[in-house]
Structures are given as structure tokens and as C-alpha cells.
Amino acid sequence: MMNKLLFFLLFSTTVFADNEIFVDQTGNSATIDLEQLGSSNLIGGTSATTTSMTALDLDGVSMTLDINQIGSSNVFRSDAIDGDNFTGFFEFDGDSNVWDLLMNSTGLITADYVDLNIDVTGSSNEADIKIAENADSSYLNLDWIITGDSNVFDFDIDYENAVNYMDINGSTNTINFTASGYSGTTASDSGYFNLDLDGSNNTLDITQSSTLARDWLSISTNSSNSNICVVQNDGGTTTSC
């Protein structure tokens, strides 16, 4: 399968101005490495346009996905990534890229022990990430490194026993983070979010609302004219900034 996929990528670069990748994987222990160089490339999902591509869909246990989109105006869209022990490496270098990720969005399949590593370098990029909104993703490890300006990142996670590290170096970025779930029973296994921010005029809206009120948050900033709103709520009255 990897040989066929590689052939398609090489062939498409000589025929089409914009490359497209379709992946529908079912089975355990799959390792998938996709790299696109240039602009206006697409890794498909149900919302993909161009030639009516369907979803990048991965179903199985112990899968590894390595995505490298190097260039501008590229799009990554996943219809569903479902399964435990998933490892994802996502590198986006360039401007005006779009990244949409759904993982166990329906809550019908577990997505525990997930390790996501995200590296974004560039400006005016957009990300929309939803992980187990209707269930939970236990023992999630989410690491971000964002370098650039005017990026917008929205992520919604239902989890327990999880850690989320975000390192932002840039200005005029917008981060919207909503965390819910049962959370852990002690401080050592709770939902933990660590943010390191360098840059000005950033806007951050963070909500942690675990059932057991075991959420932890650490923010370190070297910033001016930024707006940071944090709400921690275990079921009290509605609060907003």
C-alpha cells in the first residue's frame, strides 16, 4: 500500500497544479507518512472540495500518522481518527493553511492514550480540533509549538488524566480552548494545561469544566496588550469573560 501511495504522490505532482491525498484505513498498527511540498495541496476530508474527495478516515489501534505540509494555502481535513494508542505528528510550515481534526467525535469509539505533536510555523493559519466531545479521551498527551502571527486555533477536548502543553511565539493569535470531562481523582492525574506565551495582542479564551474540578492551569507570559480569559467551572452558575 505504501508503494502505491508513494507512486500516486509522485505522479500527481507532474500532472496537477494542486495535489490531493485520499486515505481510508481500517486495521491495527498502521504507520502512515504523508508529505506535501508546495501550495494549495489537500489531504481530504468530508468537507474537502476540489474534486469531491471524501474523508481521511483512520480506524484501528496503535496507529501512527505523520503529516508534513510545507507551503502555503494547504488544507488537512480528517473525517474521523478513531482508536486507542494513536500517535500523530503534524508539521505545517507556511501561511494561510487550514487544519481540521476530528477524533472520536461521535463518542462511539474510544480514543485513549493518544499522543499528538503539533508544530506550526507561519501566519494566518486556522485549526479546528475536536477530540471526544461526546465521550472522553483518557491519558491524552497534546503538545503544541506555534511560531507566527495572526493564527486562529479552536480546540474542544473531553478528557481525563490528560496533559496539554502549548508554546506560542507570535502576535495577534487567537486561541479558544474548551476542556470538559470527568478529569482525574487526584492532582497527579487531572486535566492539565500549560501555556507559555511570547508576543503581543494575543487573545486567549480558556474554559476548563471537569466534573470533579481537578483541572490545573499554568500560564507564563511575556506579552503586552493581550487578552486572557480563564474559566474553571465544575457545574456552578454560568460564567464568562
Go through each PLM region and give its residues.
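Cross-kingdom Sec-pathway N-terminal secretion signals
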Residues: 8-10
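Positively charged n-region of N-terminal signal peptides that target proteins for export
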Residues: 1-5
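N-terminal signal peptide c-region/cleavage motif recognized by signal peptidases
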Residues: 12-14
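Low-complexity repeat regions of mature extracellularly deployed or surface/particle-associated proteins
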Residues: 18-241
